[in-house]
Amino acid sequence: MKQLIVNSVATVALASLVAGCFEPPPATTTQTGFRGLSMGEVLHPATVKAKKERDAQYPPALAAVKAEGPPVSQVYKNVKVLGNLTEAEFLRTMTAITEWVSPQEGCTYCHDENNLASEAKYPYVVARRMLEMTRAINTNWTQHVAQTGVTCYTCHRGTPLPPYVRYLEPTLPLNNRETPTHVERVETRSGYVVRLAKYTAYSALNYDPFTMFLANDKRQVRVVPQTALPLVGVSRGKERRPLSDAYATFALMMSISDSLGTNCTFCHNAQTFESWGKKSTPQRAIAWWGIRMVRDLNMNYLAPLNASLPASRLGRQGEAPQADCRTCHQGVTKPLFGASRLKDYPELGPIKAAAK
């Protein structure tokens, strides 16, 4: 009887585990390549519906204003990023940013109500850099964001800290049961520890490929060899790349797939994953640019913020929050299902000539 109870508990636990890792049927498949080659995008209608309802909560665009009057930098003090706008454009943009980032906290989340030009609050300094980053994305990374662009809401979704940011994780020994920040579950298998993280789709792979590939631009993601033996095309200098590099690459791929809410063949050819050109889908080239965009954001905009952020906003190694694909995409192939919010706020796009 005791053994029966133990077996029943184990069965229920296993069922709960499996149910938590997979989406329930039905699933739909849209053919994306030649028939019979397993080229298709797999989606779950219930999940897609829930995400569409979530993304439909975007605050409506504020009424447009006339671009008349002197530059706002001549009206207010310490306006260093949006100083080329008119006062009306500036106030409209500031109001929108408040709705996107701190709707509960209001303007005083960033500003001192007695001195709006004061930099005493750290969000003021951070917000300035994030505005520069947003403009840089919309100006320099159109290979990835096209003309759709991004706004503060793309990542923040109504919260001061975007819901999907991550922190760098220390490399832990295989027998160390410490749980890193974004690891949801730790299990012991055959004498070593398996860390299962939502960010890598609960795969038993490298739980932090982001530090290796997205926090710097020194590491090559490509790991599949061009020949069987000897391994050609994936060497690191004169050394062959270790198996751990393959684990990290596939963990990153699992993360990208999960972040976009799609499967591998959205970008890759089912027959030959490593091939480019006509054998890959157009989305793969867009993803290639996206990886390099995220590296730029992490290295040049986010990582340097560690000097401006309080300890409560820093990771265990004293680092600022980092971005990955999920930060913007949040489970869909195009953030906000491709709806362009930049068209309503062109002030966040490429810098235009100052008002006269």
Swiss-Prot record:
Protein location: Cellular chromatophore membrane
Its biological purpose: The reaction center of purple bacteria contains a tightly bound cytochrome molecule which re-reduces the photo oxidized primary electron donor.
Subunit: Component of the photosynthetic reaction center composed of protein subunits L (PufL), M (PufM), H (PuhA) and cytochrome C (PufC).
Keywords: Electron transport, Heme, Iron, Lipoprotein, Membrane, Metal-binding, Photosynthesis, Reaction center, Signal, Transport
Protein's name in the database: Photosynthetic reaction center cytochrome c subunit
Site-annotated residues for Not N-palmitoylated: C21
Annotated heme 3 binding sites: M253, C264, C267, H268
Highest taxon above the source species: Bacteria
Main location: membrane
GO cellular component, as recorded: plasma membrane light-harvesting complex; plasma membrane-derived chromatophore membrane
Binding site for heme 1: M94, C107, C110, H111
GO molecular function, one term: electron transfer activity
Binding site for heme 4: H144, C325, C328, H329
